A protein has these predicted regions:
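Pocket-flanking alpha-helical
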Residues: 1-5
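C-terminal regulatory
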Residues: 7-125, 152-155
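A late-sequence structural motif
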Residues: 117-155
Length: 155
């Protein structure tokens, strides 16, 4: 399995695959209509899209944009969705600004990185498998394949 959280089960082998980063993205149409923020505090005047709090986030700290640059409290989101792909899609269509993992936007030409000097939290992805499969050829071949693909990608 590929997990975006480290497993807590002691009988599982975990191999770090990559460290992923997230940044702030918006569409050109959104930026044309609402302007480009020049600081984190400017985000208070923008339409922030977040993952709903009743949803288990697929990646850690996905909603960091709610509090980034604020001394107290959270920004009120313009939209709260229950799926990270839906967040990417509505931002791509001009609905707002969101923190999105970079690996989800690398092939998306309609998303522009906003506040490029601001780094969101990073997180590790792990290849995880049961101890008893450690020496099986198919797991080793798949692991090697994953590592080769990871080296060729940017996260």
């Amino acid at each position: 399995a590929i997990r975006l959280y480290p497993p807590h089960q002691p009988d599982l082998i975990q191999r770090p695959l990559f460290e992923a980063h997230s940044h702030i993205y918006a569409s050109p149409e959104y930026l044309d209509e609402y302007g480009t923020p020049s600081s984190l505090t400017d985000l208070d005047q923008h339409r922030i899209v977040i993952l709903g709090t009743d949803t288990r986030p697929p990646v850690p700290d996905l909603n960091w944009l709610e509090t980034a640059g604020r001394e107290t409290g959270k920004r009120r989101p313009a939209m709260s969705l229950n799926n990270i792909f839906a967040i990417r899609n509505v931002v791509e269509e001009g609905a707002g600004i969101a923190a999105i993992p970079d690996y989800m936007v690398e092939d998306r030409e309609r998303l522009i990185r906003v506040l490029p000097d601001i780094e969101g939290p990073s997180f590790q992805a792990f290849f995880v498998y049961p101890e008893e499969l450690r020496s099986t050829q198919r797991v080793n071949v798949f692991r090697d394949f994953l590592l080769e693909k990871v080296r060729a990608s940017q996260f």
